[in-house]
Design a protein with these regions (language model features):
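Membrane-proximal helical "anchor" segments flanking the first transmembrane region
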Residues: 1-117, 123-125
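Short Gly/charged-rich anion-binding patches and loops
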Residues: 16, 50, 128, 153, ...
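Short, composition-biased local secondary-structure segments
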Residues: 21-24, 124-130, 177-182
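Conserved Motif II region of HX4D acyltransferases
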Residues: 55, 114-118, 174-182
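Short low-complexity, flexible loop/linker segments enriched in glycine and/or proline
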Residues: 80, 156-157, 182
C-alpha cells in the first residue's frame, strides 16, 4: 500500500514518540497521554464543542463547570486508551493488567468451539483478550484512523500485544472472525 508523504511523516513521528516514551514507566506514560488528551481538548475546537454539546444533552442538569470537567476527563481517558493500544504488549504482561471475572471468561473460551463474543464498551476491556491470547485468537473492534500509516501501525502493535483488529462497520471481517475455527 502506498502512503501519502504526510502519512509517512506522521508514522515516523509516532514511531519516534513510541521509542522515546518507552524509556519511561507505564505510570508516567499514562500521565503523559492524559496530557496529550488535555492538549487535544484545547487544540481541536470543533471536537471540543461537539463533546461539550453531547455532554450537555446527556446531562442537562449539570452546570458549565461540571460539563467542562467531564469533557476533560473524557479526553484524558481517550489519551490513556491510545497509550494502551500503542503499548498493549507491555501493558498486559507482568501483572500490569487485572481482568475481572477472568475465570468466567476463560471457561467460556476454553469450553466452547464456537466464537465467544465479549462486549466491554470503553471500560478498558480489550486488554482482557490480549491477556488470554494463549487460549484462542481475540479480536477487538476499532475505528479506522484517517491516516492509513498510523492505522497500520496501531493494528501491528495490537497484534504484537495479542489482539487482532476488526475495523468498525466491516461486516465481512466480523463474519470471518466469528466463523473462524479456534
Amino acid at each position: 500500500m502506498k502512503y501519502k508523504v504526510s502519512e509517512k511523516i506522521a508514522g515516523i513521528f509516532v514511531i519516534f514518540l513510541k521509542k522515546v516514551l518507552s524509556f519511561f514507566s507505564l505510570k508516567i506514560r499514562y500521565k503523559i497521554f492524559e496530557g496529550f488528551g488535555i492538549l487535544a481538548y484545547h487544540l481541536i475546537k470543533k471536537r471540543r464543542l461537539l463533546t461539550i454539546d453531547n455532554i450537555k444533552n446527556a446531562f442537562p442538569e449539570k452546570n458549565d463547570k461540571d460539563i467542562e470537567k467531564i469533557a476533560k476527563e473524557s479526553y484524558k481517558t481517550m489519551g490513556k486508551m491510545i497509550m494502551t493500544s500503542i503499548f498493549l504488549e507491555e501493558v498486559t504482561r507482568d501483572g500490569n493488567t487485572v481482568v475481572e471475572n477472568e475465570k468466567l471468561m476463560r471457561q467460556a473460551c476454553e469450553n466452547n468451539e464456537k466464537s465467544v463474543l465479549i462486549v466491554s464498551l470503553h471500560l478498558g476491556g480489550f486488554e482482557a483478550g490480549s491477556r488470554m491470547r494463549n487460549i484462542r485468537k481475540f479480536y477487538a473492534v476499532f475505528r479506522n484512523q484517517k491516516n492509513r500509516k498510523i492505522n497500520d501501525l496501531m493494528s501491528k502493535w495490537r497484534e504484537k500485544g495479542g489482539l487482532n483488529s476488526l475495523p468498525l462497520h466491516d461486516s465481512d471481517a466480523l463474519r470471518s472472525a466469528i466463523n473462524e475455527k479456534s
